[in-house]
Structure formats: C-alpha cells, structure tokens
Amino acid sequence: MKLRRHDLEQIFEQSRAEYPDECCGILTAPTVDEPSQVHRCRNIQNELHAKDPQQYPREARIAYFIDPQQLYQIVAGAEKKGEVVTGFYHSHIDCDAYFSDEDKERAMAWDEPAYPDAVYVVVSVYGDEVRNTKAFGWNEESRDFVDVEIDIID
C-alpha cells in the first residue's frame, strides 16, 4: 500500500473531525503499485441503527457502514478511469488500531475477500490525537488478514 504523506494526513484529519464516531473511506489508484487517492465517505451506521437496531445493533462510535451510493459511485468512477480499489480505511475510537472480527466479516463475501488486493487501513484516534495506524491485507496462504506495511511517500 502506497500513500502520499498528504493523503495519509487527510485520513488523520477526517478521523479527528468525525470523532467520536468512526470515519471511513475508500482508496483508489491506477494500479495497486501506485500511490492511492483518498475518497472520504459518509458513515451511515447511526442512520441504520436508528431505523433497525435489531439488524444494526452498533452505533457509529463502534462501527462504520460506508454509504452504498458513495461506494458504488467511487468504484464505478475508478473502473471507468481504468483504476482499481486499493483499499478502505476507517478509524477506531479510543482504542488501538487492529483488524477486528467485525472488520474481517465486512471484508469478506462467501468466505473470500470481497476485494482481494485491497488493504484495510485502521487509524486509532483518541480525541484530537491519532495514536496509531496499521494496515491489513489478505494472505492467501494463511487465509486471513495480516499486517502489511504502508509505504509513505513524501
């Protein structure tokens, strides 16, 4: 995963701005080997929870759900330009950056990664302080998500 420092700072800024709710977004690039562009998305978890707390028991403070219209527009726009989805990002509120069981479940479709080449960036934010950032990618051999490096480009 390659990110320009400026783009990583955009993710940090969004994480702080949307605190105490989790933020979320999508990363795209011409190829998985090129620096990714950040696409901020709206976390609609609170709206879903308000409409159907049985199906969506968690609030945006501990969960995220990317607006499906934004997801479609960003993915379709990337494909139209010959680009690919290189990753997704979200923040964790007042806890460490880790890939939770819920994160894994959302990243999968029928026991396979929905976006096999995508990297999932998780930002740990406490108030206005970003404390940690980690990235996770699919490992076919272990059939699980594992830590991967973020290559930060100045």
Q: Which sequence ranges carry the predicted segments?
A:
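Histidine-centered divalent metal-coordination motifs
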Residues: 90-94
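Conserved beta-strand-loop surface patch within small alpha/beta domains used
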Residues: 1-85, 96-154
